[in-house]
Every structure is written in structure tokens, then in C-alpha cells.
Regions:
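Sec-dependent signal peptide cleavage junction
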Residues: 6-21
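The feature marks proteins involved in alpha-glucan
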Residues: 21-49, 84-188
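Carbohydrate-binding surface patches
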Residues: 44-53, 57-60, 587-628
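Conserved, mostly hydrophobic/aromatic
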Residues: 54, 105, 164, 214, ...
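C-terminal beta-strand-rich structural cap/linker in extracellular carbohydrate-active enzymes
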Residues: 56, 100-103, 647-667
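Conserved alpha/beta catalytic core and glycan-binding cleft of carbohydrate-active enzymes
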Residues: 132-135, 365-366, 371-527, 537, ...
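Substrate-binding/active-site clefts of carbohydrate-active enzymes
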Residues: 167-343, 361-372, 376
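Catalytic cores of secreted or luminal carbohydrate-active enzymes
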Residues: 552-578
């Protein structure tokens, strides 16, 4: 979510019953709870039987309810659990392996029994996630899972990230995909649109991206998994069970094994295609407050509060979690490690990451990279409101230099290039708005210090907050706010789509030639729109689904994106890994024209075969002339076309740059 695209708690109307009143526990008492770091929460099965362990230090009693069904019927047995006062963990065991059964916990606190909960560590659930399931995970692995491996990008700047939603990508009637909106849509290898263009996973391979960033795939609250015939839609930023795949993306949500196996099959299929999987994680808030699994196990502990006892709300969604408390910090770290190990997830995108503390994010980075050294980790370096967490401890973009191996989205390049994210008619550099040149330069150098960049003239940040380009994710649009097509239609009403597509190419050329890691939103390579809807989090498929027939209609646009990606992958000059290299190798030209940025990348930067690259961006609606050093140049991009192997030759000197386009020369 961006700071303007937030959903009220009232929007989260899932299948959970109405809230109950929880006891108010003093902050000092919550802070004194023991932190338990054992690996046996909340379910283990071994040769001796099935063991249950719930961390609930403030509970007066805890019951374990056992069920034969994941959704219907009463408990066939209730067990009183025993407390270990030193750890705050309540335990119970059964002498048999209870595979195929379901369970919930129920906590008594303040003299009252709270509602039942599957706990916070459920790894398998019944339909709608109200009861945890006991499964044999060895039976969830697809054939060949043991040899499945992470996708290797030696540096984060080598990644090219493509953001997508399961339904958006496959739901349209012309996708050619049978399992629309499902994990297993990615298992269909050679799907085609009505007019014969590749779709699905074949499209991703043709485009050339290295990673897909998939919107929330854990079990979320707003889709009723018993009513999927209704074609419900949600982005999923309303977490219910953090460690279980979302059932609506499986072919049988009532089968606890199905969603687990099918998500693994999706990851495996993408890995076989050479594409890594980045999981969008939303540990900053929960869909429910008093009725969340956190609240029903340890009321008050997992959240931050205002002095009056109400939830603080830096998420804009009704609550915010307290990563600065030991058990919550451990939870976040162990949860992402679980996804990395069990599901072979290649990376993580943290929603509203600045709600979390720097220390927790550093733990995430270190411990995930101990599993996969090539993990891609990034997040939104902002909040949607104020937080009790001190500013200096927040994982803000301004604090990114305090974090190791964690990147933040650059709202600097986003707003400078296309126009302000929330002012829909505001223009940016690519649509002819003067005064954005210095902020574009900030984007080019990945917000690192550079002797020719004046941060005081930046539109957003006023200092070089990144100490490495690997700390920056460059983008112009994502699932939030208007997609790029709709933004250009709103801000350039006088233009036609042919002109807007040209402007979109320039925008993405700035992103893909800038230092840092490029990130793009699904479908923009074929100029998809969302019919002007700026917050489509619960809009139907008619708004969100990719119309794959656009690929043939806008084939020139797709080919430009594909060739742009190929150029970046072939040339490490665009993927430097240190601020010192950027400062040494990038030289900006003095330009008098508005909406023009011109620079050179010199010295075989980052081991590139090109000794020098000349890059010029022209956001004007007219051509401009720039001076290029005389010599033998290959024209790589010009007048809305691009080819890493060359479009032609140039001798330099006075050179024309066509309107709303990029010029790239190499020698």
C-alpha cells in the first residue's frame, strides 16, 4: 500500500464473527512477558504422537479443541492444557499421530473465555482458516521438489521484478488458461490468447523478467472460500493466517493439503522457467483487531496502542503490529524463514515496512540470507500514519542505510517521472513537466551521493539516503493508485494512446537504465489499464484482469519492453553495485533545456563491454538537439525503438533526440 491507498478496517468483512471486548492489559505487564524461542510452536508430530504448544503468558487457562472436520461439526474432544510459567507456553499431547484432524485453541483471560483460534502458527487450515489442520508435510511436496532451487541473481540490482496478482494474470476469458485465478495457472506452459500471442508463464519467459512479485498469497480474510462461484476478488492486504497459502487460489480450499501442494507446484514451475518468486508480506497489521489470532492468544501483546488503550494505526487499516516486542519480532523473522524453507520463496516485499523496526528488518535480512544468499528483500519505506515507534527506529527509506540487504521503493523517481501519485492530473518529466530534472538525476544514481546531483532541488527527498544502489527499487507504478496507462490518460487528456504509449516507453526506459533494481507492474508491457480505478483492491475481474488481446494490438509496446529488459540484462553498466562506482562512472551533462536529462556512463562501468554509454531523456513534445562526443557510436535506442545489438550508427556531434523518447548510444 502507498500512504494514500489504504483500506479501512470496515472494508475487511470476512467470514469471522463480530468482535468481542478484550481485557485491557497494562503495557508494562505485556512488556514483561517472557520471549519463547523454541521451535515447537504450535504443533509438532513425532514418533511419540501429536504435541500442541501455545504461547499465551497472560492466560489463566487454555483449552485445546479437536475436530474431525475443518469447518463443520463440534469438537470431538477438549483437552485442558498445562502451563509452563517460565516460558508462558501451554502444552498438551496426544499419543497418536492425528493427521487429518483439525484443532483450535481457546484462551481464558480476565475471567472470560475468548473465542476459539487456530493460533498464530497454523501452517495448514480448513476452509476459511478457522481451524488449523494436522497434515503430513512430506505428502505436500510435488515430484522433484527436493531438487528445486532458488533463482540466482548475484546482486539485488541484477533482479528485474514483475508485480502480479494471481487472478489478474489469468482470469480474463482470453488468457487461454484453464485454471484461472489459481496457483496452478502457472503450470500451463504454452497458453495463448484468442489472437495467438503467448500468455501466462510463457509470456513471462518471453518478456525476460527474473522475478515475479506476487501480491499476498497467505490466507487472508476477505474472500469466502466456500462461495468461490461468486468470483470474489481482493488484493489480500488483510492477513488472517500468515503461514498458510490462500485457499481461494487453490482448486479445493476444503482440502488442507491442496493449497500447500499447489502453491509449491507454482513455485517449482516458475523456478523451472528461471523465474524467482517474491512474496508480498503484510506483517504490519491484521484484518481483524480484537478478533485476530494474535489477540485471541495473547491480547494486547502483538500490537501497539495509544495512551488511551486503543490501537495505534500507522497502517491506516485499524491497527499496527509491534515488531519491537521480542515475540513479535521473532514471529516475523521465523515466518519469512518458514516460507523461504518450506515453499522455496526467493524474496520478500514488506508492505508498509516502516511500521517495523530497523532491528527486526536486519534480522530478517540476515536470517533469510543464511538460507538463500541471493534472496531479494525490499519494502515500502513509509507508513500510512503516525506510530508510537520512534522515527529513528522505523524502517523508513530515510533509515535504509541502517539496514543491511534491504531495499526501499523510490517514490522520488516514481513521482518525478510520471507525476504525483495521488494528484491524478499532475504531470511528470515524461509528460512535459519542468522542474523534475534533478529528481530524475537522483533516480539515475539510485539516491546515492553524487557530486553533480543537488539534492536540495529534489521533489521528495532532500539528501542522499542510500549508500548503495542495492538499497533502491525503481518504479513508476504498481498495484496501488492509478496504473501507468490510466495515469497518462488522466494527466495527458489532449494526447491519444499512441502518444501515451510512447511516453510510457520513456518512463520505463528511465527506470530500467537507472541504477538500482527495476520493478514493473503486470500488463504495462501491453499497455493495460484499470478503467481509471485508482484503488482496485476489491474491484471485479472486469477492472483488474489482464486483457491478453492487447498484446497483439500493442505488440510494438511489448517488443520495446522486452528489448529494454534484454539490454539491461546484457549490460552491467546499468547494474552497478556501489555508490563509489556510480560517482566515478556517471557524468551528467549541463543541459539548458527543460525536461531533458543527459549523462554518460564511462570506464567500462561494472565490467561492461561498452566503454561508454550516452543516455538522453527528452520529456518534451518536440525534438531537442544535444552534443555528443564525436566518435563511432552504435545507436541502441532512438525515437521510441530499442535494440541492444544496434539500430544503426552515429558519428556523434550535434544529435537530435526525438520528442518523448530516450536516446541511448554506445561505443
Amino acid at each position: 500500500m502507498t500512504v494514500t491507498t489504504v483500506m479501512s478496517a470496515a472494508a475487511f468483512m470476512g467470514p469471522v464473527a463480530s468482535a468481542q471486548t478484550l481485557p485491557q492489559i497494562p503495557e508494562e505487564e505485556l512488556n514483561a512477558y517472557p520471549v519463547y524461542s523454541g521451535k515447537d510452536l504450535e504443533l509438532t508430530v513425532d514418533a511419540e504422537g501429536t504435541h500442541f504448544a501455545l504461547w499465551s503468558p497472560g492466560a489463566e487457562a487454555v483449552r485445546l479443541h479437536l475436530y474431525a472436520d475443518g469447518h463443520n461439526g463440534d469438537a470431538y474432544e477438549t483437552v485442558e492444557m498445562a502451563k509452563d510459567a517460565a516460558t508462558g507456553v501451554w502444552r498438551a499431547s496426544k499419543s497418536e499421530k492425528l493427521y487429518g484432524k483439525f484443532y483450535t485453541f481457546q484462551v481464558k483471560i480476565g475471567g472470560e473465555w475468548l473465542k476459539e483460534t487456530p493460533g498464530v502458527w497454523a501452517k495448514a487450515v480448513g476452509v476459511n482458516g478457522q481451524r488449523a489442520a494436522i497434515v503430513d508435510f512430506s505428502l505436500t511436496n510435488p515430484e522433484g521438489w527436493g531438487s528445486d532451487t532458488y533463482v540466482v541473481t548475484p546482486h539485488q540490482t541484477d533482479a528485474i521484478v514483475y508485480e502480479m496478482h494471481h487472478r489478474d494474470f489469468s482470469a480474463h476469458r482470453n488468457s487461454g488458461i484453464v485454471n484461472k485465478g489459481k496457483f496452478v495457472a502457472m503450470l500451463e506452459p504454452c497458453t495463448e490468447s484468442d489472437n495467438g500471442e503467448l500468455t501466462g508463464i510463457a509470456h513471462l519467459k518471453e518478456l525476460g523478467v527474473t522475478h515475479v512479485h506476487i501480491l499476498p498469497s497467505y490466507d487472508y480474510n476477505t474472500v469466502d472460500e466456500t462461495q468461490l462461484v461468486d468470483r470474489q476478488y481482493n488484493w489480500g492486504y488483510d492477513p488472517l493466517n500468515y503461514n498458510v497459502p490462500e485457499g481461494s487460489y487453490s482448486t479445493n480450499p476444503a482440502d488442507p493439503y491442496c493449497r500447500i501442494r499447489e502453491m509449491k507446484e507454482m513455485v517449482q514451475a516458475l523456478h523451472k522457467a528461471g523465474i524467482g518468486v517474491v512474496m508480498d508480506v503484510v506483517y504490519n497489521h491484521t484484518a481483524l483487531g480484537d478478533d485476530s489470532n494474535f489477540s485471541l492468544t495473547a491480547p494486547g501483546y502483538y500490537y501497539r496502542h495509544r495512551p488511551d488503550g486503543s490501537y495505534s494505526d500507522a497502517s491506516g487499516c485499524g491497527n499496527e503490529t509491534a515488531s519491537d516486542r521480542g515475540q513479535m519480532s521473532d514471529y516475523i523473522v521465523n515466518s519469512v524463514k518458514y516460507w523461504a524453507k518450506e515453499y522455496h520463496i526467493d524474496g520478500f516485499r514488506f508492505d508498509l515496512m516502516a511500521i517495523h523496526d530497523v532491528e527486526t528488518m536486519n534480522r530478517v535480512s540476515a536470517e533469510v540470507r543464511a538460507i538463500n544468499p541471493y534472496a531479494v528483500i525490499y519494502g515500502e519505506g513509509w507508513t500510512a500514519g503516525d506510530s508510537p515507534l520512534p522515527v529513528e527506529r522505523r524502517a523508513l527509506k530515510e533509515n535504509v542505510s541502517k539496514m543491511q540487504g534491504v531495499a526501499v521503493f523510490s517514490d522520488d523517481i516514481r513521482d518525478a517521472v510520471k507525476g504525483h501519485y495521488s494528484r491524478e492530473d499532475d504531470r511528470g518529466f515524461v509528460s512535459g513537466k519542468a522542474g523534475q530534472e534533478e529528481t530524475v538525476k537522483i533516480g539515475v544514481v539510485a539516491s546515492t551521493s553524487h557530486p553533480q546531483v543537488d539534492y536540495s532541488k529534489g521533489s521528495n527527498s532532500k539528501f542522499a539516503y542510500a549508500t548503495s544502489p542495492e538499497m533502491i527499487m525503481n518504479y513508476v507504478s504498481c498495484h496501488d493508485d492509478l496504473c501507468l496507462t490510466d495515469k497518462l490518460r488522466k494527466s495527458m487528456p489532449e494526447a491519444n494512446d499512441s502518444v501515451r504509449m510512447r511516453v510510457a516507453r520513456l518512463a520505463q526506459t528511465i527506470v530500467f537504465t537507472s541504477q538500482g533494481t527495476p520493478f514493473m507492474f503486470t500488463g504495462e508491457e501491453i499497455f493495460r489499464d484499470k478503467k481509471g480505478v485508482h484503488n482496485s483492491y476489491c474491484s471485479p475481474d472486469s477492472i483488474n484482469a489482464i486483457d491478453w488481446n492487447l498484446k497483439k494490438q500493442n505488440r510494438e509496446q511489448f517488443d520495446y519492453y522486452r528489448n529494454l529488459i534484454a539490454m539491461r540484462k546484457a549490460h552491467p553498466a546499468f547494474r552497478m553495485t556501489s555508490a563509489a562506482d556510480i560517482a566515478r562512472n556517471i557524468v551528467f551533462d549541463k543541459v539548458k533545456e527543460d525536461c531533458v536529462v543527459s549523462y554518460s556512463i564511462k570506464n567500462h562501468a561494472n565490467g561492461d563491454e561498452w566503454q561508454e554509454v550516452k543516455v538522453v531523456f527528452n520529456g518534451n513534445d518536440r525534438e531537442v538537439t544535444v552534443n555528443v562526443a564525436k566518435g563511432n557510436w552504435t545507436i541502441v535506442a532512438a525515437d521510441g525503438k530499442i535494440d541492444k545489438d544496434g539500430l544503426g550508427k552515429s558519428k556523434g556531434g550535434k544529435t537530435v533526440v526525438a520528442s518523448r523518447s530516450a536516446l541511448i548510444l554506445a561505443r
